[in-house]
Amino acid sequence: NVTGIDASDKNIQVAKLHAKKKNLNINYINIVPENLKQLNKFDIILNLEVVEHVENLDLYLESCFRLLKPKGIMFTATLNRTLTSYIKAIVGAEYILRWLPIGTHDWNKFIKPEELEKKLTRLNFLMLDSTGLNFNPFLQVWNRSKNLSVNYILVSKKN
């Protein structure tokens, strides 16, 4: 079973259209994890480009920990707080290329990998892996990289 949650009803509606086109059976819920009272816990949580948008990151991560089964895996992809990420993700993607609406990102909410690792470790997550993600705009593809200066993903396991 697959469940997708999002705070934005618009995002849920778009996701439902994508799932329908691909004939996928996904249960979507318009809710934030902090408000999800789930009896069944999840084996895997994918936080992909989410944490840089939440108001209370500590509460959000605590909620994810609570919703994850013991030894469950969480993937957290986000943006590093560097000058390079500011130039690429805000100036480039929002102002120059107009891939995203201006104001989508707040650079102050970007989080360095070591800061995110510290928060997750404090919650009793075990860090399994980290990798950089680089986007090639000419080929429209993402590649894994050792460079975590802009986009990166952390893989952690609930202890």
Task: Label each residue range with its predicted role.
Residues 1-86, 113-116, 154-158:
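Conserved SAM-binding loop
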Residues 18-21, 91-92, 142-146:
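Short low-complexity, flexible loop/linker segments enriched in glycine and/or proline
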Residues 78, 95-115:
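Acceptor-substrate binding/catalytic loop of class I
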Residues 140-159:
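Core SAM-dependent methyltransferase catalytic element
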Residues 107-130:
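Short alpha-helix
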Residues 81, 135-137:
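Residue-level marker for beta-strand->alpha-helix junctions and adjacent short loops that shape enzyme
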Residues 85-95:
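Short, flexible, mixed-charge acidic loops at enzyme active sites
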Residues 54, 107-110, 146:
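Short, solvent-exposed loop/helix junctions and linker helices
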